[in-house]
Amino acid sequence: MPAESSSTTPAIADEAPSVDMRSDTVTRPTERMYERMRQAPIGDDGLDGDPSTVELEGTVAALLGKDAGLFVPSCTMANLLAVLAAGGRSEQVVLEASAHMYMTERGAGTFTGMFYQPVAGTSGAMDLAMLEAALKPAGHRLATALVAVETSHNNAGGAVLPLDHLQAVQAIAQRRGIPVHLDGARLFNASAALRVEPAAIACFANTVSVCLSKGLSAPVGAVLAGPQPTIARARTLRRMLGGTQRQSGIMAAAGL
């Protein structure tokens, strides 16, 4: 019989630890998060409020320089609520052509009959002349209800929009009386890249969404922040979409 080979294949347990680079959505909660979740004061967010959820909403709103916040299960829902709160059937949302809200989400178009108008851009930044041309006035059959921007920009390889671009988009929209929504799922990445506070980016939008379960490594959740009347409207819409949660403070605590 042939002699057995002396070579062996190393056991998987002996291999060097691997790092999962597929997405920042695979991040795991820290031990401090687990501990805070275990100790979180809780209530019923659908009845008279959950204290940990209320604390998170206020903390994020203050961090972004906004009046109020709303905790929701995902940033997709936060973006959807921003769209629904801003407009209605047969109105238009204008956004960059490769934006996550346009390429992946598009929930408002399905649920409300709103139209998403893409504008060509470079590295996630809309061409400003094309943006201006895309805006439709009130009374038009496709009146523009909202302009949306995204930073950092997922489909542009994580590109961070310059502050002067955000300021220019805001100025164009304001001249037409149109609110701006910032899809800030990765806003804190942009904040770190630009070396500015999150509020210095959020100030160029009426409403802002931030995700807790990506780079921040919380297990679930997002916050929509903006003016009090808009967030009150979004809270009602959240219930209609089935997004109201009960002892949500267990999850919200990880974001604190």
Give residue ranges: language-model regions.
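Conserved PLP-enzyme active-site core in the AAT-like
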Residues: 2-256
